[in-house]
């Protein structure tokens, strides 16, 4: 049975982990979201978020976007290849509703599936 938890081992926590991804990333871009990925040797995917106050002014909007990103990752983590991902949200994502954001994320995650 699959485990759909989003545990600490599935998160990028340290700046060295983020720098590892930023040093040689594999990019997948849309007009609203940019996902950087780099393979790891851990055997499972990990997620890091970079949602800046400069791009998205209000905290409740940043938190909503982070929740949606984590939720789509949590549900699809068993299909993803073993990579470290950093998700960067762009300014114009605030104009989308939740359903469109989820559809965009699922489309991008499908590029990284096994």
Swiss-Prot record:
GO biological process: one example: tRNA 5'-leader removal
PROSITE patterns in UniProt: RIBONUCLEASE_P
Reactions that this protein is recorded to catalyse: Endonucleolytic cleavage of RNA, removing 5'-extranucleotides from tRNA precursor
Pfam family, one: Ribonuclease_P
Tagged with keyword Transcription regulation: no
Enzyme class: hydrolase
CC annotations in GO: ribonuclease P complex
Keywords: Endonuclease, Hydrolase, Nuclease, RNA-binding, tRNA processing
Keyword Transcription regulation: no
EC annotation from Swiss-Prot or TrEMBL: 3.1.26.5
TM region positions: none
GO MF assignments: 3'-tRNA processing endoribonuclease activity; ribonuclease P activity; tRNA binding
Stated role: RNaseP catalyzes the removal of the 5'-leader sequence from pre-tRNA to produce the mature 5'-terminus. It can also cleave other RNA substrates such as 4.5S RNA. The protein component plays an auxiliary but essential role in vivo by binding to the 5'-leader sequence and broadening the substrate specificity of the ribozyme.
Membership in a protein family: Belongs to the RnpA family.
The protein's assembly and partners: Consists of a catalytic RNA component (M1 or rnpB) and a protein subunit.
Entry protein name: Ribonuclease P protein component
Lineage, highest ranks first: Bacteria, Pseudomonadati, Pseudomonadota, Gammaproteobacteria, Enterobacterales
